[in-house]
Every structure is written in C-alpha cells, then in structure tokens.
C-alpha cells in the first residue's frame, strides 16, 4: 500500500512528531507527549464504539478483550481524566450488550477455541465491572468464564486418553457437540493453558475454594507444550538462531500411527506460524511462573509427578519465555521500520482464513503490553511505538478507522526476505486477502488491532 501524505495536520494527526515517509522510523517513546497519545486513544475508542457490535462469535470475544485491556491501560495512566472516565462508562453498557450476545448462541455449535477467547475476555470484564461497581454483571461474567467456557473446553476439547502419539493429551479444536473433532493446534491449547492459569489466579486472589482443578489443568497443558518442545526432531519450535524461537501454528509428526498428521482446517503449510500464538504463549508461561510454588505444593501433596524438580521446572519456563521473546524480536519485527509484522505465509494472509488471522498482530501487542517493558529480557518499546505510529498514520483521517495494512510495499518485501533468510521458509510479501470479509467485522477487528497497539503504547509512557 502506498503511504498517504496528508496535507493538513491536526492535534490528532501525528504522534507529536512531523510526518515522515516511513512511520516505522518513529521509535522513541520518550519523544511522545502523553496528552497527545491520550487524545488519539479517545478518538480510536470512539470509532470502536461505532463498529464493535458485529455478528461473529469468536471475533467478538477477542476484539472486546482488546478493548478491555486498552481501557485498563487508560485507567491506570489517567484515572481521573473525564474523557477516560467517559470511555469506562461506555464500556459498562457495551458489556451488558456483549453478555446478551454470548447468551444468544447455542454453545454446542461453537468451536473449542471460541470459548478460550470469551473466557479470557470475561475475566477482564469482571475486573472492569468490579471497578465500576456492577458486581452482579461481574459475577455473571465470572460464571461465563469458568462454568461455561472453561468447562466446555475441558469436556469437549481436552483429550483425556493416553494413546495419542507422539504426545498424549492436549486440546482439539473441534465443535462443542463433537461433530468435528478438529486438530490439536497451538491456539486452542494455549488459550486453554492461559485460561486455566488466569482462572486459578483469580480464584486464589479472591480466596475462593475449589480452584485446584484449574491448577492441575494448567500443569497438564504445560506438560503437553514442554513435551513437544523437547521433541526437537519435529520442529514445533522454529529455530531462528542465537537461542531464539517461534512456536508453529500446530505440532505435526508424519509417521505411521501418528495422531498429528492432519493438515486441514485451516490448510497447513510447512513452517507456518502466527503472531497471536507467540504473545499468548509468553503470557501463559509468565502466568505459570507466577504460580510455580502452588504447582510444586500441589504436586507434592498429590504425588502427581514423581519426576518433578522445581528448579528444573522454573528454569525451563524462563528459558522458553526468553527464547520466544528473542524470536519475536528477531523474526516478527521489520529490520527496516521496526514495525511488528505477521509471519509471511499464505495460510495467514490468504482468502481461506485471513479474516481470522488478521487480528494476530494486535493479540501479540496486547500481551507485550501486559508483560512489561522487558518481556523475556527484550525491550519492545521501539517496535510498539513504531507500530502504533504506523497504525495511526494510515487511518482514515475522517473516521479514525484503522486499516488492515499499515506498512509499505517496499518494506513488506524487505521483511519477507528477512524472514526467509532467517528460516528458509515463508512466502513472498502479500496483502490481506479479506475481500469477502463482512465490512463491519473488518472494521471492528482492525480497530481492535489499533486498541491493542495503543494499550501497549500507554504502558510504555
């Protein structure tokens, strides 16, 4: 996409820096004026208010999670600001509508990973609603997260058998009524991993009982990922050099008797990985680190793992977090513009499921922002700042609608070459092939990517 040079500057038209040809050059967060960033955030949210109420189950869960994390960052930075307070009040009523939307669906017709998105969003909704004093709706969202979303994944997606080869257990991304078993992909498993950790922490913080089953499932999901990571011959972790890795879209093992040979729904290609998985896996591992002592105590109490070593456990978690952070820094950020990119695979950008994978860059930034300035020992300030600037400077100047594309053709191709040089894999640079996507869905998802970027940016100020 050619960069648009606007002829008129307004107070909301720049990140307090002059316009440049390549907005990725804006990387110094210290040069930003917080009040200008706040105005941009308010403008971005007002557009989100106009486009968020579309009809697509999983996208609604994810985009509203972006909104809640963004709003939480706004509140922490400017708790007494009248415009921020107005945003928070608007979200109160939006959460009423979102709850009605969720309850209008037959849970048996939804895919397993849908419940992961809604479950995580519901935990953040509880936090927001308790802060605003709506305890009744907060409790409804808690039940939605635990008694419906988590329970659906446990009962209909988790594989309790010991027979799967080469790694048992894990979650299938099938539909909840069992008509389609689906594949054990990364997104379904990491969502259940992260959701189990967060439910356990929520219940523990609020001193509620009956929380051990969530701790147990978090540990089981850890074992599934750790087992795959140790089977280096199957390449579930894409090695980038210098102890940097990225996790693939799904683990595969092509041998007679393998339960991980499925290459459909969506169509798999060699080396394929997705930005969203990287952010969620770093977040899940970080959550696991926060409850490591509880896990160790539970294992000892229940004799659950005779080979468990707490020091090895902790070191392994830290190692994976650091390696993933290095992988993101090396493989998913353009060297020429510092902008966060989607991995260059047709499986991400193509017409089959591009409308789903479109949100990945935002999801990655959402968790980057939550993990702090040095996630895994890597400082992501420059890339978050550059990406937020790029998103802002390629918006529709009239509506403040963000675009699926916020990088130039030239830098896209340079990034694709950068990625192929690192991995020997990937496709040539391409645009998002989402022409068939419902327009309001597209607007809502693209706006949520911007909210994710600005939420992460606020945390850098």
Residue spans of the language-model regions?
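Mobile, glycine-rich extracellular loop/lid and propeptide segments
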Residues: 109-122, 142, 148
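N-terminal export signals
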Residues: 5-23
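The core hydrophobic/aromatic register in alpha-helical repeat solenoids, strongest
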Residues: 67-70, 121-125, 196-199, 285-288, ...
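Inter-helical turn/loop segments and adjacent helix faces that build the functional surface
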Residues: 132-133, 199-212, 288-299
């Amino acid at each position: 996409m050619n960069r648009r040079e606007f002829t008129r500057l307004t107070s909301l038209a720049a990140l307090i820096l002059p316009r440049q040809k390549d907005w990725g050059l804006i990387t110094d967060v210290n040069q930003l004026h917080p009040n200008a960033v706040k105005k941009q955030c308010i403008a971005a949210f007002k557009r989100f208010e106009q486009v968020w109420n579309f009809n697509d189950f999983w996208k609604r869960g994810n985009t509203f999670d972006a909104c809640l994390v963004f709003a939480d960052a706004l509140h922490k930075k400017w708790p007494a600001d009248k415009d921020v307070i107005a945003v928070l009040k608007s979200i109160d009523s939006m959460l009423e509508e979102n709850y009605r939307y969720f309850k209008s669906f037959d849970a048996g017709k939804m895919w397993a990973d849908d419940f992961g998105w809604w479950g995580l969003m519901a935990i953040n909704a509880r936090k927001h609603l308790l802060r605003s004093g709506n305890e009744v709706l907060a409790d409804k969202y808690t039940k939605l997260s635990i008694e419906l979303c988590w329970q659906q994944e446990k009962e209909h997606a988790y594989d309790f058998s010991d027979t799967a080869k080469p790694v048992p257990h894990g979650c299938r991304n099938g539909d909840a009524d069992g008509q389609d078993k689906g594949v054990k992909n990364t997104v379904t498993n990491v969502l259940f991993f992260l959701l189990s950790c967060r439910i356990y922490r929520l219940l523990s913080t609020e001193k509620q009982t009956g929380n051990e089953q969530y701790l147990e499932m978090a540990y089981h999901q850890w074992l599934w990922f750790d087992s795959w990571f140790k089977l280096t011959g199957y390449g579930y972790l894409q090695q980038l050099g210098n102890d940097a890795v990225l996790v693939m879209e799904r683990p595969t093992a092509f041998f007679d008797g393998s339960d991980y040979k499925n290459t459909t729904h969506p169509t798999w290609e060699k080396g394929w990985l997705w930005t969203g998985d990287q952010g969620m896996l770093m977040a899940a591992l970080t959550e696991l680190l926060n409850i490591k002592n509880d896990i160790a105590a539970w294992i000892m109490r229940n004799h659950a793992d005779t080979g468990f070593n707490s020091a090895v456990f902790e070191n392994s978690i830290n190692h994976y977090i650091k390696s993933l952070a290095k992988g993101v820094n090396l493989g998913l950020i353009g060297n020429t513009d510092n902008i966060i990119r989607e991995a260059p695979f047709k499986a991400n950008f193509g017409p089959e499921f591009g409308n789903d994978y479109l949100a990945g860059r935002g999801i990655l930034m959402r968790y980057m922002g939550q993990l702090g300035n040095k996630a895994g020992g890597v400082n992501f300030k420059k890339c978050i700042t550059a990406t937020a600037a790029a998103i802002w400077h390629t918006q529709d100047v009239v509506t403040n609608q963000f675009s699926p594309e916020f990088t130039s053709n030239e830098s896209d191709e340079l990034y694709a070459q950068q990625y192929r040089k690192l991995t020997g894999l990937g496709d040539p640079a391409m645009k998002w092939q989402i022409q068939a996507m419902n327009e309001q869905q597209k607007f809502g998802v693209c706006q949520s990517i911007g909210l994710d970027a600005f939420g992460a940016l606020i945390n850098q100020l």
